[in-house]
Structure formats: structure tokens, C-alpha cells
Amino acid sequence: MTSQSIMLLVAFLGVLLALAYPLGLFMAKVGDGTAIRGLGWLLKMENALYRLAGLDTQSAMSWKSYAIALLVFNTLGALFVYAVQRLQAWLPLNPQAFGNVSPDSSFNTAVSFVSNTNWQGYGGESTMSYLTQMLALTGQNFFSAATGIAVAFALIRGFSSRSAKSIGNFWVDLTRSTLYILLPLAIVVSVALMGQGVIQNFSAYQDVALVDPVTYQQAKTTADGQPVVDAEGKPVMETLTAKMQTIAMGPVASQEAIKMLGTNGGGFFNANSAHPYENPTVFSNFIEMLAIFLIPAGLCFTFGRMVGDMRQGWAVLGAMTLIFVVMTSIVMTSEQSAHPAMQALGVDQTTTALQSGGNMEGKETRFGISASALFTAVTTAASCGAVNNMHDSLMPMGGFVPLVLMQFGEVVFGGVGTGLYGMLIFAILSVFIAGLMIGRTPEYLGKKIQSYEMKMASIAILVTPTLVLVGTAIAVLVESGKVGIANPGAHGFSEILYAFTSAANNNGSAFAGLSANTPFYNTMLAIAMWFGRFAMIVPILAIAGSLACKQRLAANAGTMPTHGPLFVALLVGVVVLVGVLNYVPALALGPIVEHLQLFSH
């Protein structure tokens, strides 16, 4: 790591902590339902929304009622997003006259945005109208994030309640999360990004003449975007000359803000946050990274405040930060090292005052190695998936890091809400293991952890590895899966493993070398995204309901402290161990083999 990388990482974590602490305390008030001083006007708006919807806000929900309401709301959201895409050609705010999106791509995109994954098998600026981007996709960026916060609130109430039958009201949690947290933050970040040059308009795309025409070759494709191959299976190339360039416009800043704050990640443009209209400067890049981690980090303090012991929140945040710093150091070091293939060509990859050095393939020169590597770690530690560089061009160990961060279960800060409740599931597993070692019934925050909680926790932990490994196995076995591989060998396998890892863990980033906009991958990845999201949420709500019914016991001499360095070390060990055990064989076939092959020559 260079001194620049170290300084950037320290500055990032310092600013994050300074902002996340007060936000976490504020979110605790939102979760508790208490009145917030100075925001009486928002309370009036909130109550007006309840009256408009005919909701009884005093009606408490059991965990089953909460889960049903959540599933119904998100299913209706998916149907709405699907319908908007399928009717896009006849709807307004479509200056480029884009046609209707295909059924399989619409299905994949609807599930993707509702599940907070934002996997994109399409190019936003060449597929989606402004209305689709704003009404369907940006809308779900808010609602999917609010759903995650609501589930986190419900689980926290399970720990903090005493012999309660309710874990809250889903509709209230959804409304308050959107109104008090997501909307205000999105407005602030949108304005900040516009100040840095992120565009926000409804203009038609602009056609401009190039100063120098560009002649280039590209693989020929069919009408549906599939590569044309010759008799030997090699891609057929065609020579093209570009004299004009079409510059895409659109309401980008408003979508960019919630894309980051909600750990959604779906870009307005195909290049995502590598595009200069989404992320034009190093300062906008820093803002976007902060926005990704801000709410997940703040929720750790929310957890501590709502359970009545801030040390618990610090312990969870400490475990997350420790893993994050180690993994970020690996990707920074890996990307700063010289690429052997470039060395063989005599390319200068040393770090100087005039260049970042290292592996600059697939990276933006305005960001360089340090900011690109940090963004890579941030976006995959959180279930965001936005990218400011091409992950497919990372060094083998550089690509190993985002894969592993996702395979930990997106609990290293993780998504909005999902990171906290995912880490709390690992905390439950940790105290259970500790209880087995000392022969005592495990407790966490005064609640006994018994067989029911462990069964539900096991389901929540195992559902995503099952989806990832089974999906990857099917894709490499069937012809429709193998035809999408552009890079044979270990890297091609890594691309498929990355796709299913990203989908099942609701991240959304990709190794872009995989041709994933096909009926096979659109369907398979949509299944992984849906069950990766909701097959985890339901058992977590079941745990919340079970814990809420229990008395909160006072700590005694035999109670294991869950706020000190020993527990943090145990929690980190359990997260790493479960991730390693689940995925080591698959990782050995992908990035590890690729690393050995690259450096063996």
C-alpha cells in the first residue's frame, strides 16, 4: 500500500465515523417512533399519509403479519416495475423513443430493483426511458432500502422488548424510514453531486461531431445482442467508423444519490459510477463512498441506543471495520502491484508524481489506484454494487476480495438494514458456539438463544451459499450457461461465480465479461436475487418475533460479555470461518487458480 492509500482509508473511516454517529442516534428516534424536535411538520405529513392510506398506526403486528405485509408490498412493487418496462414505448418522458423492454429482461430488472440488488443486464442510457428510470427504478431504490431498515428495526425490537407479542408495524417503519431518513439524505447528496457536475435534466440526447473520426473493430452481434460466431466458434469482427457521438442526458443526480444511500448500485448509465456524468470528480467519488456506508454504519449506533447499551453497537461496528480494513488493504496492495503481462511488454507501472502506477487497466485516471481500490471494497462490503472501475479487469487477488466480501453474506457494513441484521445473525451464532464451549445456555442481550432461533439463523446463513453454488453449478453444466462465457478457463468460471454471488447476496456488481442479458441468466439470476433477499428476511423476522416474546434476563457472572474485544474477535472469526468453509472449493477453481497461473510465468 502507498502512503496515499493509507491516508485515503484513514480519512474515509474518520469522516464516516463523524457522520454516522449522530445519524445513528437520530435513526434510533425514528425506529422508536418518538417525536423528533424541530420536525413537527414532517410528523403532520406522516400522519396525513396514514390517513390517506387508511392505516391504523396503533395496530401492532406479529412477525408473521409483518412478513406477509412486507412480501405483499414487494411483490406488488415488482409487478409495477415489470409493467412500466413492458409499457415503456407508450408512456411519456421517453425522448429517445425507446421500445418496450423484453419480458425476460423486464422480469430480471423488476426483481433486481425490488430486492435491492440492482443487477443490470442492460445499458441504462440505451434501454430505459426517463420515466422508467425515475418512477420504477428510483422509486424502488427508496422502497427496497426502506424495507431493509424496517427489518433491522424489527430485529432490534426483538432484542429490546420484554415479553411482547409485536415487533412493530411494517407500514409505519416503511413510511418513517423513507420520510425521515432516506428522502432528506437523498436531497442533500443530490445537491452536493450536482455541485460537482453530475447532470440533472430532461433534455433529449445530444449528437455531436467528433474532432477526429475513430475507426475500430468490434464483435458483430445479432438483433437481440448475441455475438455472431464463425464455424470455429470464434467471434466475427466488423470494422466501423464513428464520426458522431451521442451524449446521453437525463435526471442523473436524483437517482445517483439514493442509488448510493440505499446501497442499491444500479447506474443511470451502463458505465455506472465510472461515467463522468455520474461521478465526475475525486470529491464526488468520496461523497459517493461515504453515502454507501453512511446508513449501514449509523445503524450500528441505532442498535446500541435502542437496546440500551451503546457498547453493543460499537462491538458490531468494530467487527465490521476490522474485516473491512484487512480486505481493503489486500485489494489496494494487489492493484498497486505491477501486472506481469504489462511488465513483459515493457510498460512502466511504477508509482510516480505523474501516474498512479500499478494495474490501471479498467480504471479511470481521475481516480487512480487508491480511490478505485477503496471504491471496490466499499461497494462489495456493502450490498451496493456500484462501480467506478471494471471489476473484470482487477488482478486475480483484487477480484478475490470483492468476491469474498460478498460471500461473507454482505455483513461487513452490508446493505441498508441488511448488513446489521446479517451481522446480528452471526452474533447469535457466535454466542451459541461460545455457550457450547462452556456448557451454558447461550444468551445475547439478555435473551436466551434456543433451538428455534438457531434453526432460523441456520436457514438465514445457508440460503445464499446454496443459491450461489447450485446456480453456478447449473450454469457451467448447461449449454445456455456456457455460451455466455467470453473468457475460458479460470477467469470464465470466476465470472459465473461472481454473477451468482452478486445476485444471491443482493450486491449487483459484475465481472462484465459474462454475457448475462440472456433468458437463461435473466431467469436464473432473478431467482437467486428474490430468494437471496426474502428467504433470508422471513427467518430473521421469525427470530425477532421469538425473541420479543422472551423476558430480558439480567447479566450475571456467567454471562458472556458481548461488547469487548474477545467477542469482537469471536464474531470476526465466525464470519470468516463460515465464509471460507462455504466457498473455498469454488474460490480455488476461480481467482486462486487464476492468480497462480498469472504469476507462474
Swiss-Prot record:
Part of the high-affinity ATP-driven potassium transport (or Kdp) system, which catalyzes the hydrolysis of ATP coupled with the electrogenic transport of potassium into the cytoplasm. This subunit binds the periplasmic potassium ions and delivers the ions to the membrane domain of KdpB through an intramembrane tunnel. It is found in: Cell inner membrane. Keywords: Cell inner membrane, Cell membrane, Ion transport, Membrane, Potassium, Potassium transport, Transmembrane, Transmembrane helix, Transport. This is Potassium-transporting ATPase potassium-binding subunit. GO terms for molecular function: P-type potassium transmembrane transporter activity; potassium ion binding. Pfam families: KdpA. The system is composed of three essential subunits: KdpA, KdpB and KdpC. It comes from Herminiimonas arsenicoxydans. It is a multi-pass membrane protein. Signal peptide: none annotated. Belongs to the KdpA family. GO terms for cellular component: plasma membrane. The keyword Transport applies.
